[in-house]
Every structure is written in C-alpha cells, then in structure tokens.
Amino acid sequence: MTPRKLALALIACASTLTACDDPNLLQAQLATVADTYDVFALTGTPASFPSGINTYIRSTVRVDGNANFDVAFDIDDSGKVIVYPVQKVVSSLTSSRRVGLRRVDGAFASVTIAPSGTYADSSIVALPGEVIVLQSMRNGASDACQFDISPYIYTKLTIDSLSLVSRAIRVQTVLDPNCGFRSFESGIPSR
C-alpha cells in the first residue's frame, strides 16, 4: 500500500471512530425481559416434564444429555429447591457452555445489577424469595456472544412458590440478553 493510500485509510478510520461519542463504549441493543416459568423437580416427576430453563431463549425445557438449559431444578427431602447449573447435570459439555450461580442478598425487585466477581459452578439450595444470579457463558459456535467482547449473559431468578405434592416450582426471572451487560432494570441497559 502506498503512503498516500495508507494515510487516507487512517483518516477514514479515525473519522469513523470519532463520529460516535465514545468509540470504546459498547451499547446494549435489547431490553431486559421479565418472565415467570413453571418447572418440575428432576426427581419424582416424569422425564418428559420440563425441569430446566434456557434463559436466553426464555423457555422451559426437558433436562437431558443435550444440555439445552442453563439451570435445572429439584426438590430435596426437606422441601427446599436445589438449583443446578448445566455442568452439574450434564458432564460432557464443552468449555464454552458453563453457567455460574451466585446468591445475592436483598429482595428480588431491589437487585438491579448482577454483581461482579466469582460465580460458583456448584448447586445452590434456595428458599422461596431468595435471589440467585446466573452468569451464562454464550460464546460457542453460533451462540449469542460468539463474537462479543464478553461471553456472558446475566439472569436473576427467585423461587416464587413450590408444590410438594405435584413437585412443581414457579420461578421468576429477569434476563439481560446483551452480552456482558449486567442490568436488571427495565428497558435497554446502559451498564
């Protein structure tokens, strides 16, 4: 490339970058979404019943070896809900499909941002009303964050209610579908 073409390319690139307020600032494109799901315990219910949630596609799913879920749910002998990240249920996962869980203090409505720091890859025993934040890695082939700077999607959830007779669990969630963004406030996140 000649020096003149190189100079023109650099000027064009600089003009493009300075056309925005801050070329380093990523902007979210999608609004956060609140959902309510009814799932069933992994044990004591038919295998055809949905026991998991795929937070990104916003759907309850059957829990099987396909690992098409972020978290699965069960009810222990004392009547408490156990929340399992996908890698605790399906062992043959790729490294690009991990989910971390973190218990967060406060009421569900008051948790407006996913905390930074460590998310454990272990199960959590949850009581109704407790808040859990999921950090779901979505950077596999043809996945949502495949080409983004951050591979993580964040969701907060709480156990709304459960029935020990039917082994049904009602779960409330708020999903921030923007890769790397942590906001649970309604609308398009700014952080």
For each predicted feature, which ranges?
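Surface-exposed, beta-sheet-biased, low-hydrophobicity segments with strongly acidic/polar composition
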Residues: 20-191
